[in-house]
Amino acid sequence: MPKHGKKYTEMSKKIDKQARYDFNEALELSLASSYVKFDETVDIAVRLGVDPRHADQMVRGTVALPNGLGKEVKVLVFAKGEKEKEALDAGADFIADEETVAKIKDGWFGFDKAIATPDMMGTVGKLGRVLGPRGLMPNAKTGTVTFDVAKAVEELKAGKIDFRVEKAGIIHVPVGKVSFGPEKLVENVKAFINMIIALKPASSKGTYLKTITVSTTMGPGVKIDPMFTK
């Protein structure tokens, strides 16, 4: 395991590793432990009491963060005809024409999210091997396969995120930037946690929210007491 630098070690001393904090305390500590010059992303990792190997315990969904992500989200749309104009008017950065599709096949990924109208899924399917591993494959379950492309583009631009529990039972997502300050970050974190709770599988037994940890890109993790979500 690589050793952390002096600054990381110094900041870690501010945090009681055995303690479980409420939302406000956790975010304030996390921001106070930021020691780099750039505007770090704030992430949250939630370990759930589920077994993702079972389909009825898969936790997956989307949530619109009240204060967005604090970064520009570049959106690519697979559409044709009037839906192209609708997507561009809503703020889409790219329309996947034949030239763009060829660029993607050659390894171009200058976008963060992809949306497709249902009638374009034949084209999208041919790119599954390159889009899928990067989490860029449009999916009806996350609202990115739809004829309402304007709404989908606007939501992604505003900070809508999609998430899915990993094999280890952990969901890890960004919830904003250090520059947001504690108040806006708390609002984003609560919106995300409330959605996770709402998606609790009926087959999940025992403790559902096992651990919740927030951290900045380079900073140490701060644990939130799951009891504060009730």
Curated annotation (Swiss-Prot):
- UniProt cross-references to Gene3D superfamilies, sorted A to Z: 3.30.190.20, 3.40.50.790
Keyword Membrane recorded: no
GO molecular function terms listed in the Swiss-Prot or TrEMBL record: rRNA binding; structural constituent of ribosome; tRNA binding
Superkingdom of origin: Bacteria
Q: Does the keyword Transmembrane helix apply?
A: no
Indicate the quaternary assembly.
Part of the 50S ribosomal subunit.
The UniProt similarity line reads: Belongs to the universal ribosomal protein uL1 family.
Kindly provide the name given to this protein in its UniProt entry. Large ribosomal subunit protein uL1
What is the scientific name of the source organism?
Answer: Desulforapulum autotrophicum (strain ATCC 43914 / DSM 3382 / VKM B-1955 / HRM2) (Desulfobacterium autotrophicum)
